Amino acid sequence: MMASVPVLEIRNVSKHFGAVKALTEVSFSLEKGEVHALCGENGAGKSTLMNIIAGVLQPTEGDVLVDGAPVKVTSPAVAQSLGLGLVHQEIALCPDATVAENMFMAATNRRRSPFMNYGRLERDAQVVMNRLAPIDVRRKVGDLSISSQQLVEIAKALTLDCRVLIFDEPTAALTESETQVLFAIIRDLKAQGISIIYISHRMAEIFSLCDRVTVFRDGRYVSMEKVADVTPDDVVRRMVGREITQLYPEKQAPAERTDEIILSVRNLGDGSRFTDVNFDLRKGEILGVGGLIGSGRTEIAEGICGLRPVIDGKVQLHGQRLRARSYAQAAQAGVVYLSEDRKGSGIFLDLSIAQNIAVLDLKSLTGPLGLLNSKAEADRAHNLVRRLGVRMGGIDMPVSSLSGGNQQKVAIAKQLAVDPKVILMDEPTRGIDVGAKSEIHRLLRDLARSGIGIVVISSELPELLGLCDRVLVIHEGTVAGEVEGEAMTEEAIMRLASGIGGHNNSKASEHAA
């Protein structure tokens, strides 16, 4: 019996950017109706290969075959004509267009008629969108949350007549319930004979969804195996080329704990997204904040650091009232915030590493005539990138040239430049590979041990449990409860996040008198 011909095959593909070899003679195959995981650390070459398949990049050497026949995928339009579709990790939507317009943009570009039936377009878009979430397709994309925009990105791909769909970290911005809906759709696509390439750093997803797993490391093919024949530890070892002995650093020892309150939040509310929020942050502590996406976690952080107006309550830093009417005022006082949208508002991709680090504290780097002291800027950048272990070609390199993990380190360095007392971090390891996650976790613990108070907002329960000393859980804009010690379990957090157990501010309220 003859073996089936792969629907997609990559043979000995290399890709060079000048002297840099992003891919070196990699091979990959995808069978009809298969969900095939592609794993590797950031910088392993996964995205480069996907961009070659999608027609964004052209290979330096090697072949791409569809149904056994060599093809030249010279553009995204050619890729679509071959039935190859890509769901980007980084959202690639037009914010000023509606959801429906974004979903069918590729299809409308192929129309020969100058007229568009918007009523039909919106009806068709709503049918597809409802498979994922009840998002009104008449809304502007720019008005949606990050998680909703990610769902629109996925829905956009479902409108294409694809035989192969590539999902690049599709669940990074999704809730658990949204993730399960996506998994059901992927399984349905598989049953229809559509083939899926699934890129993810989340081992639980790979082992529940995928048939085979291929690993790249440093731009080279490492292995391809059936998921049933390997363990998550096996895959991680192949990805990093070394043992990761401990993903999370040791938590605060009892002797390290202090009762010194560095940040106190009392009865905080903005009149719409959150109300009556109470909690304390101790010096040197990592305080986790859990809850469903949309529960108000991000908005609370924005209210504390001047990015969102508040109408009720107060914030105190070292016992003194913090009246931050702008982020600049909060940062000057010593409270900084790292956005969940790293590339949208956390860093400036086109600026150099040194410029990014300097941007929050330009005043101290300028002389009496308003001229920038380039030596002082460079010295500060060198000190911080050395302290944080940023892997780079030099501080004059654009941040866009770095991997996701190193971009996040630069975002942290930017905040450290103002010598903060408190750091609020929103999804600090989203879209970062397992090795870089471990480095970020250790960095945060080191910063906490230096006396900084850290708040970590995360949708990853293992991260909350493994990294944080305590976890506050937000439900519908207020603190539903707090867990610590042996009570810190995934079940306890999910119960509170789902509204089971009621709103309990008792621990935070003990300090409110």
UniProtKB/Swiss-Prot annotation:
GO terms for molecular function: ABC-type D-ribose transporter activity; ATP binding; ATP hydrolysis activity. InterPro entries: AAA+_ATPase (IPR003593), ABC_carbohydrate_import_ATPase (IPR050107), ABC_transporter-like_ATP-bd (IPR003439), ABC_transporter-like_CS (IPR017871), P-loop_NTPase (IPR027417). Its EC number is 7.5.2.7. It catalyses: D-ribose(out) + ATP + H2O = D-ribose(in) + ADP + phosphate + H(+). Belongs to the ABC transporter superfamily. Ribose importer (TC 3.A.1.2.1) family. The complex is composed of an ATP-binding protein (RbsA), two transmembrane proteins (RbsC) and a solute-binding protein (RbsB). Pfam families: ABC_tran. Coiled coil: none annotated. Residues 8-243, 256-501 form the ABC transporter domain. GO terms for cellular component: plasma membrane. Its main location: membrane. Signal peptide: none annotated. Keywords: ATP-binding, Cell inner membrane, Cell membrane, Membrane, Nucleotide-binding, Plasmid, Repeat, Sugar transport, Translocase, Transport. Part of the ABC transporter complex RbsABC involved in ribose import. Responsible for energy coupling to the transport system. ATP binds at residues 40-47. It is found in: Cell inner membrane. It is a peripheral membrane protein. This is Ribose import ATP-binding protein RbsA 3.
